[in-house]
Amino acid sequence: MASDQPTYDEVYVISDIHLGGQGDFQIFKDSQRLAWFIKHIAHLSAERKIALVLNGDIVDFLADQDAKCFDPMRAVAKLEAVFDNLALQDVWIALRDFVRTKKRTLILVLGNHDIELALPAVTHHLLWELCSDDESARGRIMLIFDNSGFSCSVARAQVLCVHGNEVDKYNIIDYEALRHVIVAINRGLD
């Protein structure tokens, strides 16, 4: 692995949170416990470099009755609904505080239920919700939206975090097609 990869004293990895959805489609049910955990690691020793990896399926864009496998037209509205969901407020507050804490890094890895996070408007909205205009907080977030995974060193160990859908033939993301969609959006093409 590359020698220029980040090094941390501690790395915590959580996968498949699936924030969002209404009624029976809402998978995540323990906002207070997750918020407590995020706050706990944010307030560990201020001298230690700590990373929190949300390892895919952070937001569940598929958790509603009318879900499409990829819905760029409604993605920002769906993300807004997740941020506005009162049942999830504790988690968002804890994540906002986490990225405002020195020596803390939040790493977001794309999964197969939150592909829309890679779309420019959705990424912008997500970062605005987490950081507002706090550039220091923004500098503590890493986005891994290209299927490369997140690699780092923890003490002498090498760590690689991938969501895992890339080895599941039923849930593979076509990253080249996603890149073409993003290019078209950035260039104002239909």
Segment roles from a protein language model:
Residues M1-D190:
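Extended recognition/assembly regions associated with phosphoester-bond processing machinery
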